[in-house]
Amino acid sequence: MKKISLPKIGIRPVIDGRRMGVRESLEEQTMNMAKATAALLTEKLRHACGAAVECVISDTCIAGMAEAAACEEKFSSQNVGLTITVTPCWCYGSETIDMDPTRPKAIWGFNGTERPGAVYLAAALAAHSQKGIPAFSIYGHDVQDADDTSIPADVEEKLLRFARAGLAVASMKGKSYLSLGGVSMGIAGSIVDHNFFESWLGMKVQAVDMTELRRRIDQKIYDEAELEMALTWADKNFRYGEDENNKQYQRNAEQSRAVLRESLLMAMCIRDMMQGNSKLADIGRVEESLGYNAIAAGFQGQRHWTDQYPNGDTAEAILNSSFDWNGVREPFVVATENDSLNGVAMLMGHQLTGTAQVFADVRTYWSPEAIERVTGHKLDGLAEHGIIHLINSGSAALDGSCKQRDSEGNPTMKPHWEISQQEADACLAATEWCPAIHEYFRGGGYSSRFLTEGGVPFTMTRVNIIKGLGPVLQIAEGWSVELPKDVHDILNKRTNSTWPTTWFAPRLTGKGPFTDVYSVMANWGANHGVLTIGHVGADFITLASMLRIPVCMHNVEETKVYRPSAWAAHGMDIEGQDYRACQNYGPLYKR
């Protein structure tokens, strides 16, 4: 099939239409603003897949209805998914604005004294508010000279934040969530809500029974040569941890090999179901070769699959990572236990950063007193107020070991286009594969085990659905924490020492859900969460406002909160504004 084109950013230079001197004097300055904006975005941003971001600039400056319509025709033909309107001067507000109701939009009004760019910005935003089409305001803090073509740092920050979030919105639209299986062990996030995906994200849900995965494996609907390559890769790179099962449940070498083979096959087949694979057409499986156009997926696993077949831990861990037997590549988004709401948080994080996402149980709050009682160790540094144990049976991306390095040599998780093969190998070397515990997984499997390096900034997120309200987003910025090995071992063995662990310390504010670490744990809305590298909560907030998903919990500095200008008309408290505005406007793709 022809690859679906990536969304582009549309740049709309608007201008005062009065001829005989006014428009003529502004043409060059206005178009240069558009070109400078496009240059910034193409230099600083990439799509989550790693491709360069493209900007489309209107053929002419826009002074009124006719030129606005011509611009819209061009944008419609080039898959423009978000727009930025720029101007240094007064223009005719409602005559020049972008009226597309679902396309994210921002307006940059140049802060200068010669021409009233700020006046147009205010007039245009008033029109957006009155018409119920919210837009983001960009206005520099300091006055610039008319001939100053630079983009101030505060303007650049807003342009980039808007564009990152807008590209995420546009990239999700029209894609699907592959629900492989049904409800896992009564977990509410795996009660997949089609209306949520359709109305808030512009996505479809493809529901497929797990027997389809069984069929593909049993009928060899996969690339057999690739399977051999995957097995060779695993033989070279997998280190195996101890088998903690009772003797009667331990598998011999032949049985273990069969479990590994099926685990790798599951990864291949889930990937093929998500994105398709032309190799399947070569073996006469044309229908299966197309895939389901899935930008994210979830696998139920427990218990209807895992009671008799290998669990999804190996497949999910490999798919969620930025590398496999084919080398470094874009990570997939696959939610364990088909927790679609955690899958959406993973999808948001990946679209905003291009990085792999760490899926985890929000398992245990350890107070400083409890840790000292159990281990004799007194917490200090980032961990002094207590920590949260983030751990799951193995679906976390191996990037979460943080064996990659930033430009200053610090541990991190990088966008896949920056990861070297050596860094991928280091993540693999830091991971052990432990036989699944029989009591949980009767069909066997392998769980990845690694320990996240400490001192790494992370943002933990989660989407929940509240009856009568709709979706809400939770955000907690913080850091991974490194404990002394003996302390980690004692605490880890109290849970499950064969699973990957991140010790997480959220940043506290002393208020509300961030009064203390216990309050963060107590206010978390579900049993799962996602770790995204960096303190990127502000980007999540902007993205959520575009989708009309209110944020019910965050610890982002107020100065970094960036939402459409119309939110300010919904009260004086910015979080109350968010709830009222999201309720007022309703989901982005209203149904």
From Swiss-Prot:
Biological-process GO terms, alphabetical: D-arabinose catabolic process; L-fucose catabolic process
Locations listed in the record: Cytoplasm
Main location: cytoplasm
Cofactor(s), names only, from the UniProt record: Mn(2+)
Residues given in the record as Mn(2+) binding sites: 337, 361, 528
Keywords annotated in UniProt: Carbohydrate metabolism, Cytoplasm, Fucose metabolism, Isomerase, Manganese, Metal-binding
Entry annotated with the keyword Kinase: no
GO molecular function list: arabinose isomerase activity; L-fucose isomerase activity; manganese ion binding
Pfam families from the UniProt entry: Fucose_iso_C, Fucose_iso_N1, Fucose_iso_N2
Record's subunit section: Homohexamer.
HAMAP family, per the entry: Fucose_iso
Its biological purpose: Converts the aldose L-fucose into the corresponding ketose L-fuculose.
NCBIfam families from the UniProt entry: fucI (TIGR01089), PRK10991.1 (NF008220)
Protein name as it appears in the record: L-fucose isomerase
Natural source organism: Escherichia coli (strain 55989 / EAEC)
Top-level taxonomy: Bacteria, Pseudomonadati, Pseudomonadota, Gammaproteobacteria, Enterobacterales
